[in-house]
């Protein structure tokens, strides 16, 4: 039985003080959660949020990292820096990173491998654009991302990996894939992973849905057999909304 995982991606929102206020509001609301709870603040707030969540059931994730150990990469964050802070998760390949910062699958594959070297659980984002969905090439697009991003990982690493399926057309648009659409696509993702790494690893891997997830939609999504959680954007910026999603089973 896979344990659900709900992760909040704050994106470029919340100063350190605002983030700490949000965490303090959130702590009592999710203390009895039956799922893994992760918050992903901006890089500058990671240290403060890790300290603020010590001794709680809230884990902290980063929104990105570099694939090199160190070096002349101005403005970047090394995996060892995240590990030393006590960060446990890292979002890799978010569609905004792919779209605005030119991230590609070859670099993401390096990042995946580097995350495991530094005890960071990757939340790998994959997804198709509206044009790709309307052209009926969703499965081809996702299969290519999966094959390139996961190449060379071990079965044990695959079992630990979290994939977030985020249809790009549903991010921040208010549009949401129906729960049936999400389930069908996520089942395909799991099948593709099984073809590469075997059914056992694929069955252990947790796959989230991301794309305008709200308290009103989470219950129906989580009732589906292949959906193991959510990567939450806008709704993670309000403690009550995020807690309502985290406590979807109550």
Curated annotation (Swiss-Prot):
Q: Where is the active site?
A: 94 (electrophile), 166 (proton acceptor)
Instruction: Choose one Gene Ontology CC annotation of this protein and give it.
Output: cytosol
Q: What is its EC number?
A: 5.3.1.1
Q: Which SUPFAM superfamilies match?
A: Triosephosphate isomerase (TIM)
Any one Gene Ontology molecular-function term assigned to this protein's record: triose-phosphate isomerase activity
Pathway, per record:
Carbohydrate biosynthesis; gluconeogenesis; Carbohydrate degradation; glycolysis; D-glyceraldehyde 3-phosphate from glycerone phosphate: step 1/1
**Catalytic activities:** D-glyceraldehyde 3-phosphate = dihydroxyacetone phosphate
Where it sits in the cell: the answer is: Cytoplasm
- Keywords, alphabetical: Cytoplasm, Gluconeogenesis, Glycolysis, Isomerase
Where's it mainly located? cytoplasm
- Protein family: Belongs to the triosephosphate isomerase family.
Functional note: Involved in the gluconeogenesis. Catalyzes stereospecifically the conversion of dihydroxyacetone phosphate (DHAP) to D-glyceraldehyde-3-phosphate (G3P).
What NCBIfam families does the record tag this protein with? tim
Tell me what this protein is called. Triosephosphate isomerase
Taxonomic lineage of the native organism: Bacteria, Bacillati, Bacillota, Clostridia, Eubacteriales
> Corresponding gene?
tpiA
